[in-house]
A protein has these predicted regions:
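Conserved small/polar residues in nucleotide/adenosyl-binding loops
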Residues: 177-179
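Active-site glycine-rich loop that binds ribose-phosphate moieties when present
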Residues: 105-106, 151-170
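A structural motif corresponding to the C-terminal end of an alpha-helix
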Residues: 108-123
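Short beta-strand-loop/turn "lid" adjacent to the catalytic site in phosphate-handling enzymes
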Residues: 57-102, 129-144
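A structural micro-motif
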Residues: 1, 64, 119-120
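General beta-strand structural signal in soluble alpha/beta enzymes
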Residues: 68-71, 121-127, 170, 174-175
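Short glycine-rich, Thr/Ser-proximal phosphate-binding strand/loop in the N-terminal lobe
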Residues: 3-44
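Short, well-ordered amphipathic alpha-helical segments that serve as non-catalytic structural scaffolds
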Residues: 48-60, 159
Length: 179
């Protein structure tokens, strides 16, 4: 399976191409403040970043042939952790997102690029809005201010899985504190 992964961040767009588990390309495309200042809103960077991904693939001789394209999950409505296929409801949620961040571009770019390839599907994994809090963790000093979870779920879950693999333990069997 050939996969393109796209991770838009505040000042860069990271991409990687994998054939199964073998990396074929890992690239960090940096964006200067000057480049990004031309865009009034983060969402306006969509075409710019999408085109940079396509250019990077061409420059590195990677044919535009993928089975799946994975974008960094955006600031959607809260959902449990996992891998999700990009759908119309998700795209609409991002279009009307309460918060603006470059990560919102991930599923948009993945969906648009996947639509160009027959049989290719677009996904996100463990977006920053993963919400698996126990009810007691939602308690704040005021019922008027409910706790909202926004965290780097993708990174922290990956580190937990890596650590569990080093211990030859399944990560659900571990009790870890993410800081």
């Amino acid at each position: 399976m050939k996969i393109l992964a796209i991770n838009p961040g505040s000042t860069s767009t990271k991409i990687a191409v994998y054939e199964d588990t073998t990396p074929l390309l890992v690239r960090n495309i940096r964006h200067s403040v000057g480049e990004l200042s031309h865009f009034p809103r983060v969402i306006d960077q969509f075409e710019f970043r999408k085109n940079l991904v396509i250019e990077a693939l061409k420059e590195n001789g990677i044919p535009f042939e993928f089975d799946a394209i994975v974008g960094r999950g955006g600031l959607l409505k809260p959902i449990p952790g996992g891998v999700y296929e990009v759908n119309d409801a998700m795209l609409d949620d991002i279009a009307h997102a309460m918060r603006s961040h470059a990560c919102n571009l991930g599923c948009l770019i993945a969906a648009e690029l996947a639509a160009l390839l027959p049989g290719c599907r677009a996904f996100i994994a463990d977006p920053g809005v993963v919400d698996e809090l126990d009810e007691i963790a939602r308690i704040t000093g005021s019922p008027l201010m409910p706790r909202i979870t926004i965290w780097h779920a993708l990174n922290q879950r990956a580190i937990a899985r890596r650590y569990a693999a080093e211990l030859t333990t399944a990560s659900p069997d571990l009790s870890l504190i993410h800081i």
